[in-house]
Amino acid sequence: MVAIFNFQSLLVVILLFICTCTYIRGSYPSLLEVRDKHSFSGLPRKAAIIGERLSPWVSACCLIMGLWTLYN
């Protein structure tokens, strides 16, 4: 099933996107720097900021979703 139509899959995709963007920004900060922060190209930068500022919550959500996927 497509991840857009399944809420659990959509959450997994969003969490993986946030974690990936945060990792990329930590390793290669110049990759996510864009001039127009309000366009679609600024979305990975915003996801990286969310991942940095809410890292305990994002990691807890990743852990919960991983266990949910494993046992479901």
UniProtKB/Swiss-Prot annotation:
The chain crosses the membrane at residues 48-68. It is found in: Golgi apparatus membrane. Residues 69-72 are cytoplasmic. Residues 1-26 form the signal peptide. GO terms for biological process: intracellular transport; protein secretion. GO terms for cellular component: Golgi membrane. Pfam families: DUF1242. Belongs to the KISH family. This is Protein kish. The gene is tmem167.
